[in-house]
């Protein structure tokens, strides 16, 4: 399953030579009109495991879909990685559990990932991230003691 904004698809032909392929485009110029979830539903596709990469809003939707369908889901996160070894914490994402390295609810995308089981990480919207930063909290605890 591949999703694109429009007909400017890439790798579709190459990937299609290895497996059956469904395509969704937001404008409907190729394949199903809409998101990858629209195509999955329209074509009645099923899976035991989902592997996803792409923009955060899409990953949030895939994560929610997988949880509702009881499907194991792995997501690949894209973050800027300053040091690449986990020391600077510049690539952290919010996580469900406390990280042993930093003692906060973060995962280091460069060191712990970039691929995570979907329910291990929180996929915050830009607004949610902004609210946490303005509140002075990047650890996910929002100043609350456990």
Task: Show where each model-derived region lies.
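Amphipathic, positively biased hydrophobic alpha-helical segments used for protein targeting
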Residues: 14, 65, 95-97, 121-124
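FNR/FR-type flavoprotein reductase catalytic core
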Residues: 1-82
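Residue-level recognition of conserved structural "scaffold" positions that shape functional pockets
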Residues: 10, 61, 91-93, 120
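Short, surface-exposed amphipathic charged segments that create phosphate/polyanion-binding patches used
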Residues: 37-41, 87-95, 124
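Local cysteine-cluster metal-coordination motifs and their immediate loop/turn environment
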Residues: 56, 79-115, 138-145
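Iron-sulfur (Fe-S) cluster-binding modules
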Residues: 9-12, 18, 40-47, 105, ...
